[in-house]
Swiss-Prot record:
Cellular compartments per GO CC: plasma membrane
Family: Belongs to the peptidase M48B family.
Predominant location: membrane
Disulfide bonds: none
Keywords, comma-separated and alphabetical: Cell membrane, Hydrolase, Membrane, Metal-binding, Metalloprotease, Protease, Transmembrane, Transmembrane helix, Zinc
Cofactor: Zn(2+)
Protein name as it appears in the record: Protease HtpX homolog
Signal sequence bounds: none
Gene Ontology molecular function: metalloendopeptidase activity; zinc ion binding
Name of the encoding gene: htpX
Positions contributing to Zn(2+) binding: 138, 142, 213
Lineage start: Bacteria, Bacillati, Actinomycetota, Actinomycetes, Micrococcales
One BP annotation, GO: proteolysis
Length: 301
């Protein structure tokens, strides 16, 4: 039930982002009396989405300064991923370790054949093998569910909306009131849209990210057959991230943070609509309910 609801919610949220983008395009066309800008943004959006999607693994791994690892360097990580990928009938992803004590993990890649899973040094030291299995099951399901495509589209459209809103603000100020022709519309409406559209795009993008996390929690726990292992891991990761947070001033890390299993930055100042991840307490409660209901089918154990 949750899975179908979350899938529909993701589609509706992506649709909402395109509605915002079209509204900006309509406003720019009215303010400048030139509809060519709509086509320009559409082409740029498609190219940006394609580049981000095709190179998602390289961009994310590079941003975390991660290095590839062998079975000898990370035997537990390698063995768990090998077992789970075999149980899921999927190819083995490439494995990386990021040199930071902040406990976290993420998966990236445009499809299972070009996937990568990265753990930080901190998470490998913090979790026991059962908890690590829960985390890796979660990350593998992001790849199998094609979440990278969803997040790439959302990020690209959000970026285009921000750029388009800046252009709309300029057009509304300098181009909205020329002559006696009122076809350009009210410049105040354009200014209001220019200010609110990027905020709306960000809220929608973050809502999509939170929705995909819930799905990966559920599907990953079904793959491992152990929802409580992931619940225990999330509890430890939240505490570890508070003790060893990542740098919020590092833009590359910020751009990758939505891929991570938990918020890598300290504190809970950002709440509600502006969370990159669902509240850890909510995720743990769902996993505990899943365990009580007997959810999960043990795999590769």
């Amino acid at each position: 039930m949750h899975r179908h609801y979350n899938g529909l919610k993701t589609v509706l949220l992506l649709g909402g982002m395109w509605v915002v983008l079209l509204a900006i395009g309509w406003a720019i066309a009215g303010a400048t009396r030139n509809s060519a800008f709509i086509m320009i943004f559409a082409v740029v959006g498609l190219l940006g989405t394609a580049y981000s999607y095709w190179n998602s693994d390289k961009l994310a791994i590079r941003s975390m300064r991660a290095v590839p690892v062998t079975p000898q360097q990370a035997p537990a990580m390698y063995r768990i991923v090998h077992e789970l990928s075999q149980a899921a009938g999927q190819p083995m992803p490439r494995l990386f370790i990021a040199p930071t004590m902040s406990p976290n993990a993420f998966a990236t890649g445009r499809n299972p054949e070009h996937a990568a899973v990265c753990c930080t040094e901190g998470i490998l030291q913090l979790l026991d093998e059962r908890e690590l299995r829960g985390v890796l099951g979660h990350e593998l399901m992001h790849v199998y569910n094609r979440d990278i495509l969803t997040s790439s589209v959302a990020a690209a459209v959000a970026g285009i909306i921000t750029s388009a809103a800046q252009m709309l603000q300029f057009a509304a100020i300098f181009g909205g009131g020329r002559g006696n022709d009122n076809r350009g519309g009210n410049p105040l409406v354009g200014l209001l849209l220019a200010l609110l559209a990027p905020l709306a795009a960000t809220v929608i993008q973050l809502a999509i990210s939170r929705t995909r996390e819930y799905d990966a929690d559920e599907d990953g726990s079904k793959l491992t057959g152990d929802p409580l292992a992931l619940a225990s891991a999330l509890r430890k990761i939240e505490g570890g991230a508070s003790q060893f947070p990542m740098d919020p001033e590092d833009q590359k890390v910020v751009n990758t943070s939505h891929l991570m299993i938990a918020n890598p930055f300290r504190g809970g100042a950002v709440t509600g609509l502006f969370r990159t991840h669902p509240a850890t307490a909510d995720r743990i409660a769902r996993l505990e309910n899943m365990a009580r209901a007997g959810g999960g089918n043990p795999a590769g154990r």
